[in-house]
Amino acid sequence: MGLRKYKPATPGVRFMIRNDFSGLTKKEPEKSLLVPLKKTGGRNHYGRITVRFRGGGHKRQYRLIDFKRDKIGIPAKVSAIEYDPNRSARIALLVYADGEKRYILAPNGLQVGDTVLSGIDAEIRVGNALPLENIPLGTLLHNVEIRPGSGGKIARSAGVSCQLMAKEGNYALLRMPSGELRKVHIKCYATIGVVGNEDHKNEVFGKAGRTRWIGRKPHVRGMVMNPVDHPMGGGEGRGKGQHPVTPWGMPTKGYKTRRGRRASDKFIVRRRNQV
């Protein structure tokens, strides 16, 4: 998989860098693993905006991804590597020995025809899922559970991974993609390897229209709003008149907003800002 740059034939492609999709092996998704995806425009069930600057975009269908990897001991063959519009990573279509089909995140190096397995007896090989207690130190992981049986929550974006640093009692020490060191129970499952499509971070949309295609609207600065719409709005000229704040008056640009004394604090050995 690589990136494609364009000659400046038009203003829209002058700076555009996009994926060439050369690693995909199938164009149409598996129909049995699709569910409808209704757009919300950033609104909740009360109709109130909970995420600003969302709306429009191309219609999508959601691909059901197996984050739990709970078919223990049943081998599966990689049937295809596909595009997923709902995430930055590619997805792999698995066909299990009993005939069931599932999607998983496609790690770097996984190819069509490979066999993957979940369980304590699985080999340390890209695409296999094992409990942390059965994985050697230093291994790069993705799709890591926070609680046993909850399904993978950590390291699911394109090109990211966790590293298993140590094991102490009932907990394993993981280095997160952010650099944070965190304890996770050793019974939690994780998948071997780094999430594929690592060139995603180097893509450049090149024009505002491509941002609208994915459902993002222009992000308006508070300083150019009216006083009724933002604490920093109004005034003569471009003066802020105060420290930068969010639309709800909370200080921003470096202000720490994480609530203190959370129950999960005991699992964080080193914060990401202490690296």
Curated annotation (Swiss-Prot):
GO terms for biological process: cytoplasmic translation. InterPro entries: NA-bd_OB-fold, Rib_uL2_dom2, Ribosomal_uL2, Ribosomal_uL2_bac/org-type, Ribosomal_uL2_C, Ribosomal_uL2_dom3, Ribosomal_uL2_RNA-bd_dom, Translation_prot_SH3-like_sf. SUPFAM superfamilies: Nucleic acid-binding proteins, Translation proteins SH3-like domain. It comes from the Bacteria. Residues 236-263 are annotated as: Disordered. One of its GO terms (molecular function) is structural constituent of ribosome. The keyword Lyase does not apply. Signal peptide: none annotated. Gene3D superfamilies: 2.30.30.30, Nucleic acid-binding proteins, Ribosomal protein L2, domain 3. Keywords: Ribonucleoprotein, Ribosomal protein, RNA-binding, rRNA-binding. GO terms for cellular component: large ribosomal subunit. Part of the 50S ribosomal subunit. Forms a bridge to the 30S subunit in the 70S ribosome. Belongs to the universal ribosomal protein uL2 family. One of the primary rRNA binding proteins. Required for association of the 30S and 50S subunits to form the 70S ribosome, for tRNA binding and peptide bond formation. It has been suggested to have peptidyltransferase activity; this is somewhat controversial. Makes several contacts with the 16S rRNA in the 70S ribosome. This is Large ribosomal subunit protein uL2. It comes from Pseudothermotoga lettingae (strain ATCC BAA-301 / DSM 14385 / NBRC 107922 / TMO).
